[in-house]
Amino acid sequence: MKRSSVASAGAIALAASLGFAAPVAAEDEIVVGHLTYHTGEFGAFGPFFDGVAEMVLSKINEDPPLGRPMRAVHQDIGTVGEARAARKLVDSDGVQILLNPAHSYLSYREFMLETVADKGLPLMPSVHGGAIEGTIGGTSAEPIFRGSPLDTANGTAALLHVQEAGKKNVVIIATEVAGSQLQKEAAVRTAEAIGFEVLGDFDIQAGESNYRSVVARISRLNPEAVVMFSSPQAGGSLVKNAAEAGESWYIVGSGEWQETEFYDTATESAIAQHEAVVLAANSHADNPSFQPYMDFANASKWIGDIGDPANSYAIQYYDLLVASALAIEKAGELNTASWTQAMYDVTGGEGEKVYSYEEGIAAIRDGKDINYDGVTGTMEYTDTGIVSGLFGIFEWQDGALAQVGSVDGDKVLELESM
């Protein structure tokens, strides 16, 4: 080991003396363990999630934090489970960043707390952290910072849209997945808070070959609207089965329905038969961040996997990873204690407003305080690592997702705090 280190040092010195850039040693990398899906109920998201992560890291690596390029290790959780995948990334791959603790975090929380306490790593930014209880995160002992509001907020937004659409009652259903359950419970609570009639709320199995019995059960209740929280495949199947049964419903789905698997499963003809098929998801801000982001994403080699860069997951990946990288530069080291404080510093306060990674990294290196506002809008965090968001209503039109409305974010936050 000593001989290898001396040889490496000599090679670097020789390269410098000859005027060449010194090669980056593997130990200088920042390794990002990406908890993603390649198999299972959400397996269709895999190429998209991986492509988005690679696209964002390519932007950051044009001028990486602390001069240390960031490299992703994409780890499927669909088959082995989130807990086992997380342990593999931390113990075997030695990642410094664990990206996307999510639905099953509580099953390995003790392991992560012990690891962070012992090593001061990994950092835990999470696009899917909205499925984690809102009292968890935002501390050096548990450095979870979310890229989106809590999942419950999307459930609240979906129900508010039903009311704004002029409907008088609703049936609310969800698959037995943690995030879907949280959204359903929030929608039911919202209905109670605003005095909206819920004709029924019930759970369904994920991954069924068809949902004809569910369609029949809903039909007997004769609702004016149906709200469903599920995977793209399950949602698409229900939409198609309902159309096959001759139903024409006002359907509001969850953000997962942004994946093309939903559109392909539901089919264009079935969607057209319904009164409406829309979904509630986070939308982008109208600020200087958006167009440069779109231009970069569309020009990247991963655009074929990403599809529409305005997808809420894509913009959340972008802002979260950019903010995380800026915080690493601000901290001056890779450690949960300094990074946690830096996450608050670079996303809030009275610092110089910046709208891109380039602006932020340059300002930090000039010794300035910054306040990063990204594609999703303000990135200011609560003391448990929760970020706010903008809420849009979307529908599939000729194979492409289009925003057709919005939901009052202040009203969502008001109901969420009750």
Predicted regions and their residues:
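Extracytosolic ligand-binding ectodomains
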Residues: 2-4, 10, 26-418
